[in-house]
Amino acid sequence: TPPPPASPAPPPPRRTAEANDVLSLLLATHLYCVLQAVDLRAMEFEHTKAFEPMVTELLKQHFGALATAEVEDKVRKSIYKRLQQNNSYDLEQRWHDTFSVATGAVVEALAGQEVSLASLNAWKVACAEKAIALTRSVRDSFWAAPSSSSPALKYLSPRTRVLYSFVREEVGVKARRGDVYLGKQEVTIGTNVSRIYEAIKSGCIAPVLVKMMA
């Protein structure tokens, strides 16, 4: 009978420590990115809640009874489709471009109706200007809120809220807002990832994870 195959030798201790360090760094980077994505998605939800009624109101204001639910639906689809395509544009350019494209959807939806070019242009300009102002307002109020009362918290479950609050408040890693928005150099992404990494390596995050699983 042939002897059983030998068990593989365990990795050297130094390699094990290196693997743990790499894994901790990957977890820290992933957690940083996930929380930033949570904040941005929550900001989008807050914006949408105010944006859609605004579009409806301006359609009715400029086109009256012609602005039926069907017309609103076509225009809304055109807007969101264009926003997916021009997300690399600056704020003002993006909204003016979006409503220039959406004007075509209005023309198509109201084909056969008497709609003046002046009304179309007035609607386009009004929508773009109000969308720009709304975006700035939502963004400013979102970033101004302390982490303990961030609008993002209401979109999280009680368990994930614990982890969000730990990173944002106890570790002190805030959402990245950008140097242009702040008007000065912000703490680098690498520095913030390092803070989360240290919380993982030191074991500070362990009670938080236990609380999440309770």
What do the PLM-derived regions correspond to, one by one?
Residues 1-214:
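C-terminal auxiliary extensions adjacent to catalytic cores
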